[in-house]
């Protein structure tokens, strides 16, 4: 005993720092999300992750190494069992692969969660739904949970039965998934199936009904333009989905004293619901609202808690995909013309905006110090009357163009006004405006995200065209950490990163 104690005392501080640190459930959510983005992070990325989740860099490195090893082992096991599968199931799509399947460790299974075990035998779908709705108000049931779904959601109503018939994928090396850059050229789901974008959701609250991780996931499916919640209770799986066009408002709010934040959604219609029972694996059957008191059908506001920075980045990726899908064919000249049209920046209250014509709805997203507004080209009878814009100061002489889209945002009232577009060609335009707020830090996409992967639009626009009227170009250039040639890069596919190069942040004092 004395020898052991003596040996332990000879450890250096560096050796003690290198000891493995057990991750809690909250840290694991962030680690899994980062693993989906990149399975082999470099030293800078590991340092960023360790600072974000308060773990040592060595512990982060070990977690990634172990996860890659488990994934390769699972892949070898899958290959050895391929002969046992029917020919129709031999090809596996990207959506069939779960990082959580191969990375789930005792850290999650033994995480401190109050568990209520239910041993009730449920003989019918109706009984399961009743049992599920009542159970969700308490605490989640401790089960092994697969965050990624076997099939992407369908865009049609869930009143019918769906089976596992997702398109086959040619990807067999799952270790490369973290390095994949989605093909963002305009296409249809029949040509390519993009992987879903997952939001690290620790809890979901709708009215008084609450669901907790790890029996919960939220993802955006680009192929169907659908948001989908996936939940489990014992061996029964539940889905709640709605089209992205059903979202009236979506924004990320954060506590300045905490790393956690909330993704807030407001819907204009109730979601559709489906269930998959153990007796019919792979078959999703439409069902009634399984939430307690059917609150998911009656309450339109959803609150999803999770790491604020990651929620913010994932929301920007969703906007990027949708923006590029709609506006991929817009010419550089059209974008430059719209940027140059000048009442877009009209007063000190105007935040940087992203204006994208998509479907017939309006989405406004507060993300960090940015406000992203996605508005549709509505008929005149549905248009909001524009409010008068204050006259700009002498430093910025701008004149309204006939085809400009004016976005005036009142941060307190959260209202976005726009004028009717007289030029139909301007309907499919994207304007990316840099927002510079005194005394604030504007986060952008992580430093591993290269703009060249997602767009070939690299026109540089004068800083003077993008500034609020109370800031001069000289003030910005002298007070910012980094601006490429005093210019911003037009990049409609990355709403949160309209700057040249790969930046961690841009500060203005």
Swiss-Prot record:
Superkingdom of the organism of origin: Eukaryota
UniProt keyword Chloroplast present: no
SUPFAM superfamilies assigned to the protein according to its UniProt record, in alphabetical order: Homeodomain-like
Chain segments carrying region Disordered: 1-26
Gene Ontology biological-process entries: cell differentiation; regulation of transcription by RNA polymerase II
CDD domains documented for this protein: homeodomain
Annotated organism of origin: Yarrowia lipolytica (strain CLIB 122 / E 150)
Record protein name field: Homeobox protein HOY1
SMART domains (UniProt xref): HOX
Coiled coil: none
Cross-referenced Pfam families: Homeodomain, PH_TRF2_HOY1
GO cellular component, one term: nucleus
A GO molecular-function descriptor: RNA polymerase II cis-regulatory region sequence-specific DNA binding
Keyword DNA-binding (UniProt): yes
């Amino acid at each position: 005993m004395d020898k052991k104690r003596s040996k332990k005392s000879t450890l250096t501080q560096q050796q003690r720092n290198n000891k493995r640190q057990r991750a809690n459930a909250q840290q694991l959510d962030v680690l899994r999300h980062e693993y989906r983005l990149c399975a082999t992070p470099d030293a800078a990325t590991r340092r960023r992750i360790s600072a974000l989740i308060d773990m040592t860099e060595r512990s982060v490195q070990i977690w990634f190494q172990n996860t890659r090893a488990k994934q390769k082992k699972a892949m070898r096991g899958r290959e050895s069992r391929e002969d046992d599968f029917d020919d129709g199931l031999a090809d596996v799509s990207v959506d069939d692969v779960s990082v959580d399947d191969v990375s789930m460790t005792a850290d999650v299974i033994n995480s401190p969660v109050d568990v209520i075990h239910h041993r009730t035998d449920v003989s019918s779908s109706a009984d399961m739904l009743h049992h599920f709705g009542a159970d969700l108000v308490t605490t989640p049931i401790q089960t092994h949970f697969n965050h990624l779904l076997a099939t992407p959601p369908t865009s049609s109503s869930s009143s019918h039965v769906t089976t596992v018939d997702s398109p086959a994928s040619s990807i067999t090396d799952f270790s490369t998934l973290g390095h994949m850059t989605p093909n963002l050229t305009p296409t249809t789901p029949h040509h390519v199936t993009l992987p879903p974008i997952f939001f690290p959701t620790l809890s979901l609250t709708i009215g008084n009904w609450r669901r907790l991780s790890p029996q919960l996931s939220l993802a955006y499916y680009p192929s169907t333009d659908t948001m989908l919640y996936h939940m489990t209770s014992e061996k029964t799986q539940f889905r709640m989905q709605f089209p992205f066009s059903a979202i009236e408002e979506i924004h990320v709010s954060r506590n300045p004293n905490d790393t956690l934040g909330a993704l807030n959604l407001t819907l204009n219609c109730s979601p559709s619901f489906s269930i998959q029972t153990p007796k019919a694996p792979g078959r999703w059957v439409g069902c009634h609202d399984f939430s307690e008191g059917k609150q998911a059908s009656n309450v339109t506001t959803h609150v999803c808690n999770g790491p604020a920075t990651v929620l913010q980045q994932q929301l920007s990726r969703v906007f990027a995909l949708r923006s590029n899908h709609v506006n991929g064919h817009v010419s550089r000249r059209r974008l430059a013309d719209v940027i140059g049209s000048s009442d877009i920046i009209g007063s000190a209250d105007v935040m940087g905006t992203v204006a994208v014509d998509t479907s017939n709805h309006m989405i406004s997203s507060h993300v960090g110090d940015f406000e992203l507004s996605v508005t549709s080209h509505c008929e005149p009878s549905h248009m909001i009357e524009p409010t008068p814009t204050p006259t700009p100061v002498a430093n910025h002489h701008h004149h309204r163009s006939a085809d400009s889209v004016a976005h005036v945002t009142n941060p307190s009232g959260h209202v976005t006004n726009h004028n009717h577009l007289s030029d139909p060609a301007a309907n499919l335009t994207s304007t990316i405006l840099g927002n510079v707020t005194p005394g604030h830090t504007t986060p952008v996409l992580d430093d591993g995200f290269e703009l060249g992967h997602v767009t070939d639009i690299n026109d540089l626009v004068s800083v003077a065209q993008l500034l609020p009227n109370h800031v001069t170009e000289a003030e910005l250039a002298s007070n910012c950490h980094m601006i490429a040639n005093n210019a911003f890069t037009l990049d409609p596919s990355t709403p949160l990163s309209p700057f040249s190069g790969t930046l961690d942040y841009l500060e203005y004092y």
